[in-house]
Amino acid sequence: MGYQLFEFENLKDCHKALTERFKEFFNTALKKHHQISIAFSGGRSPISLLQKLSVLNLKWHECLISLVDERIIDTSHDDSNTKLLHDYLLQNNALKASFIPLLPEKISSDTNALFNFANQHFKQPHLAILGMGTDGHTASLFPETSAFLNEEKENIVLTKPINAPYERLSMSVNALENCEKLFLSISGVEKRGVLEKALKENAPYSLPIARILHSQKVTTEVFYAKN
């Protein structure tokens, strides 16, 4: 368990390698399971990767696509991760995949209802593709919040970041550790510094990504691009 680190000089080569690894995992997992489930992270960073994955010649009709996390906003909003996946991943060949939303089409102000909706519709992913912020957060598990530390068995947790906008729904540490594999994609010198600190210091309260990298339950394959 723990992690494996793969380093690349640029993002193009990094995404190429990650795309090949994704294909390998996808095809191998389908041999073991009748249907596979894969969760994707949002944000601006993975757009080019999502576009590359969307054109892969895979058995997408046997794949369930879900989100690692989502902001509690209308799913047509530009900051919505749901919109991001529909715009960049669920296109081309990947349009044949089925999408499992974290939020209903009509967003209410009742966060408990949204929390219940997300957990009721949750399907445990075989693979989750993660990103990481310069503050060490992953999914929507942020520093100085308690959501990622709880030992309860919810698959989806409600988080309220201190230094980021919007309340969010996020896969819990428990759900992430129940994946067969995790991929972490990061780039840039600053994030490399955060990664190295997380690898040296298992301090999940200040660096949530450390909780994942030091997991005894799941291996994280880290794809790092220098530029």
Curated annotation (Swiss-Prot):
Reactions that this protein is recorded to catalyse: 6-phospho-D-glucono-1,5-lactone + H2O = 6-phospho-D-gluconate + H(+)
Assigned protein family: Belongs to the glucosamine/galactosamine-6-phosphate isomerase family. 6-phosphogluconolactonase subfamily.
Enzyme class: hydrolase
Transmembrane segments: none
Phylogenetic placement of the source organism: Bacteria, Pseudomonadati, Campylobacterota, Epsilonproteobacteria, Campylobacterales
GO biological process: carbohydrate metabolic process; pentose-phosphate shunt
Keyword annotations from UniProtKB, A to Z: Hydrolase
Span of the signal peptide: none
Encoding gene (name): pgl
InterPro entries, per database record: 6-phosphogluconolactonase_DevB, Glc/Gal-6P_isomerase, NagB/RpiA_transferase-like, PGLS
The protein, known as: 6-phosphogluconolactonase
CDD domains per record: 6PGL
Pathway connected to this protein: Carbohydrate degradation; pentose phosphate pathway; D-ribulose 5-phosphate from D-glucose 6-phosphate (oxidative stage): step 2/3
Function: Hydrolysis of 6-phosphogluconolactone to 6-phosphogluconate.
Pfam families (UniProt xref): Glucosamine_iso
GO molecular function, one term: 6-phosphogluconolactonase activity
Organism superkingdom: Bacteria
Record EC number: 3.1.1.31
Keyword Glycoprotein in record: no
